[in-house]
């Protein structure tokens, strides 16, 4: 428990499963997923896209396997990437078996559309034989006909009933290495369904607002939907669904987690919207800095505030801070640089971007060195 208890999030207690090398649920960090949008049969393009997603921080990547040619390509894809791969399967139970044999870490299936009980048993057998976990993926847009007839429309009750009935199918086959999602494009519906499901079971939950929209609108909708659930302690892994490239989904996912102090990766910029008091062009400065610092993976906070109204206060709370020294029209004004929350020196507008990049890179190197030293000391401490 921290001193600032208003920041604490009490996460729902869930079971822990493995998706390849990544743990999901239990005390594991909330993982970030995305999905490729290339033709899976185009191995080179799919591998390149997965690698870009991985560079952005993706923990897990899903790949669609609609046909035999796609599952045939899966083995070559998996051999060339480092992140665990989830095979997205619908309707064809043989695709699930083929994906497991190809090395998929997880099978995203809907047991209700895989086929007969015997076919489900075959899929479970393949998953067990090859160390695959599964995701039961319920979607408001594809609920079973009988549930729509029972409830009249997609609703939280129908989605939870679908999820739990599918969970029982796997449980009846002595398989519990699975997570569940109950997605909808309506954030209200999705949140209500996830909250009800969280009360009804202890399986890890994969969060998402499906078909959320384009980069801007989808980001806002996902931040509200996924963010509100995470804030309530619900959720073990997330996928931000955007009509955008997979790496953009990953970046948005991490921004949501960073905002809630659940995961930290890279530079978190605190910046003002700017006004007539700004001592430098805040908007342009932030844009350039975010681009030039995108390679940093070490968690660091950087405040960029255009004037002294809020600048010093924000700088005290960040690793590196910059506060504008006067009106933009005032030539020769010097801006104050803060290091570890303490006023350290001044810098002019012309040199400040290069200077801040150097400071952040130096700070990142220091943090990385300390972490490496700590890890190197752990075995020696344990041996003593």
Swiss-Prot record:
An example molecular function term from Gene Ontology annotations: iron ion binding
Cofactors, names only: [4Fe-4S] cluster
Reactions listed under catalytic activity: (2E)-4-hydroxy-3-methylbut-2-enyl diphosphate + oxidized [flavodoxin] + H2O + 2 H(+) = 2-C-methyl-D-erythritol 2,4-cyclic diphosphate + reduced [flavodoxin]
InterPro entries: Dihydropteroate_synth-like_sf, IspG_bac, IspG_bac-typ, NO2/SO3_Rdtase_4Fe4S_sf
Cofactor note: Binds 1 [4Fe-4S] cluster.
Organism domain of life: Bacteria
Amino-acid positions noted as binding [4Fe-4S] cluster in the UniProt annotation, renumbered to this chain: 272, 275, 307, 314
Keywords for the protein's UniProt record, in alphabetical order: 4Fe-4S, Iron, Iron-sulfur, Isoprene biosynthesis, Metal-binding, Oxidoreductase
The EC number(s) this enzyme carries: 1.17.7.3
GO biological process, any: isopentenyl diphosphate biosynthetic process, methylerythritol 4-phosphate pathway
Record pathway: Isoprenoid biosynthesis; isopentenyl diphosphate biosynthesis via DXP pathway; isopentenyl diphosphate from 1-deoxy-D-xylulose 5-phosphate: step 5/6
NCBIfam families: ispG_gcpE, PRK00366.1
HAMAP family per UniProt: IspG
Functional description taken from the UniProt entry: Converts 2C-methyl-D-erythritol 2,4-cyclodiphosphate (ME-2,4cPP) into 1-hydroxy-2-methyl-2-(E)-butenyl 4-diphosphate.
The family this protein is said to belong to: Belongs to the IspG family.
Protein name: 4-hydroxy-3-methylbut-2-en-1-yl diphosphate synthase (flavodoxin)
Classification lineage: Bacteria, Pseudomonadati, Pseudomonadota, Alphaproteobacteria, Rhodospirillales
């Amino acid at each position: 428990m921290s001193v600032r208890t208003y920041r604490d999030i009490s996460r729902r207690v869930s079971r822990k499963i493995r998706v390849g090398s990544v743990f999901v649920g239990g005390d594991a960090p909330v993982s970030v997923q995305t999905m490729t949008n290339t033709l899976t049969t185009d191995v080179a393009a799919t591998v390149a896209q997965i690698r870009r997603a991985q560079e952005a921080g993706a923990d897990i990547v899903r790949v669609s396997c609609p046909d035999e040619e796609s599952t045939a390509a899966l083995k070559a894809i998996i051999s060339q990437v480092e992140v665990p791969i989830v095979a997205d399967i619908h309707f064809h139970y043989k695709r699930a078996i083929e994906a497991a044999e190809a090395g998929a870490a997880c099978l995203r299936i809907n047991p209700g559309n895989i086929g007969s009980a015997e076919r489900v048993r075959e899929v479970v057998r393949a998953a067990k034989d090859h160390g695959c976990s599964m995701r039961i993926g319920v979607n408001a847009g594809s609920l079973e006909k009988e549930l729509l007839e029972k409830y009249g429309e997609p609703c939280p009750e129908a989605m939870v009933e679908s999820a739990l009935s599918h969970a029982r199918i796997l449980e009846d086959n002595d398989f519990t290495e699975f997570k569940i999602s109950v997605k909808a494009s309506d954030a209200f519906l999705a949140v209500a369904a996830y909250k009800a499901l969280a009360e009804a079971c202890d399986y890890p939950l994969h969060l998402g607002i499906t078909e959320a929209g384009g980069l801007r609108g989808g980001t806002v909708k996902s931040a509200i939907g996924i963010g509100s659930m995470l804030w309530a302690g619900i959720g073990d892994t997330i996928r931000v669904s955007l009509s955008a490239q997979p790496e953009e989904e990953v970046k948005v996912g991490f921004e949501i987690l960073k905002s809630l102090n659940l995961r930290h990766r890279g530079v978190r910029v605190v910046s003002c919207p700017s006004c007539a008091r700004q001592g430098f062009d805040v908007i342009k400065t932030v844009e350039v800095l975010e681009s030039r610092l995108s390679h940093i993976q070490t968690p660091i906070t950087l405040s960029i505030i255009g004037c002294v109204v809020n600048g010093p206060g924000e700088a005290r709370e960040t690793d590196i801070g910059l506060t504008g020294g006067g009106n933009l029209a005032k030539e020769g004004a010097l801006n104050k640089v803060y290091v570890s929350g303490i006023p350290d020196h001044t810098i002019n507008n012309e040199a400040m971007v290069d200077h801040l990049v150097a400071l952040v890179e130096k700070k990142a190197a220091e943090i990385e060195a300390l972490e490496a030293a700590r890890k190197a000391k752990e075995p020696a401490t344990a041996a003593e």
